[in-house]
From Swiss-Prot:
GO biological process: base-excision repair
UniProt keyword annotation of Transport present: no
The organism's place on the tree of life at top rank: Bacteria
SMART domains from the UniProt entry: AP2Ec
Organism classification: Bacteria, Pseudomonadati, Pseudomonadota, Gammaproteobacteria, Enterobacterales
This protein's name: Probable endonuclease 4
Source organism (scientific name): Salmonella newport (strain SL254)
Protein family according to the UniProt entry: Belongs to the AP endonuclease 2 family.
Function field: Endonuclease IV plays a role in DNA repair. It cleaves phosphodiester bonds at apurinic or apyrimidinic (AP) sites, generating a 3'-hydroxyl group and a 5'-terminal sugar phosphate.
Binding site for Zn(2+) 2: 145, 179, 216, 261
Reactions accelerated catalytically: Endonucleolytic cleavage to 5'-phosphooligonucleotide end-products
Residues binding Zn(2+) 3, per UniProt: 182, 229, 231
Length: 285
């Protein structure tokens, strides 16, 4: 079964996120558990935690259907010790917030070397950052998102994701989220079913589908292999509809959150309905 949704707002309280997801016909959703542009946030109160759990139950969202995202400020591979510690503390707080809310996944961008340390050293720092957070939490999987490779961001090659996973001690609590726009911009072709087969065969060989814990379904304004991160609405960008139809009709993408971060929230309901229809088309066929 496919879990399909979007990254919804938690404005006005975390309990509003499941309701907003339900309004657009979603069977999955992503959210920020705090302001993503601030380092610190007030601790979650028992009331906030209870309200969120009740709302998830009301709208039939289990933890397996929810893919929270951490702050954009965090850089788990930061080359400067003080900044690295600040990021590690913030990441631990994000993991602990998920644990308190009964969530089992936390999606994050791996990190950047900022042209100051070697790529291998940065990847090792990211893995160690994950180890530190996992050692102080229970039940939450750290989900590494592939990047477009913009600037000095790492995680744009499957080999880099595999290297981070290799450095994580508890393999049962690390996974990846593949963003289709990022993959395309990083040079993984998705424009035809044949290209999708090739790209995900490579993913399976290098990373492994056992680590796939979520996806971001985004078309790309950016050009193939451009290393530029620019999302677009499904079918409107340079990837086109075929990739998303192919994903909907492949069982390897069942049982994980498939999250839209497309640029027009006004048509998320339509995009979700279209994705669901592709799945039904497969069943009929």
């Amino acid at each position: 079964m496919k879990y399909i949704g979007a990254h919804v707002s938690a404005a006005g309280g975390l309990a509003n996120a499941p309701a907003r997801a339900a309004e657009i016909g979603a069977t999955a959703f992503a959210l920020f558990t705090k302001n993503q542009r601030q380092w610190r946030a007030a601790p979650l109160t028992p009331q906030v935690i209870d309200d969120f759990k009740i709302a998830c139950e009301k709208y039939l969202f289990s933890a397996a259907q929810i893919l929270p995202h951490d702050s954009y400020l965090i850089n788990l591979g930061h080359p400067v010790s003080e900044a690295l510690e600040k990021s590690r503390d913030a990441f631990l707080d994000e993991m602990q917030r998920c644990e308190q809310l009964g969530l089992t996944l936390l999606n994050f961008h791996p990190g950047s070397h900022l042209m100051q340390i070697a790529q291998e050293d940065c990847l090792a720092r990211i893995a160690e950052s994950i180890n530190i957070a996992l050692a102080q939490t229970e039940g939450v999987t750290a989900v590494i998102e592939n990047t477009a490779g913009q600037g000095s961001n790492l995680g744009f090659e499957f080999e880099q994701l595999a290297a981070i996973i290799d450095g994580v001690e508890d393999k049962s609590r690390v996974g990846v989220c593949i963003d289709t726009c990022h993959a395309f911009a990083a040079g993984y072709d998705l424009r035809t079913p044949e290209a999708c087969e090739k790209t995900f065969a490579e993913f399976g060989k290098i990373v492994g589908f056992q680590y796939l814990r979520g996806m971001h379904l985004n078309d790309a304004k950016s050009a193939f292999g451009s290393r530029v991160d620019r999302h677009h609405s499904l079918g409107e960008g340079n990837i086109g509809h075929d990739a998303f139809r192919w994903i909907m009709q492949d069982g390897r993408f069942d049982g994980i959150p498939l999250i839209l971060e497309t640029i027009n929230p006004d048509i998320w309901a339509e995009e979700i309905a279209w994705l669901k229809a592709q799945q039904i088309a497969e069943a009929v066929a």
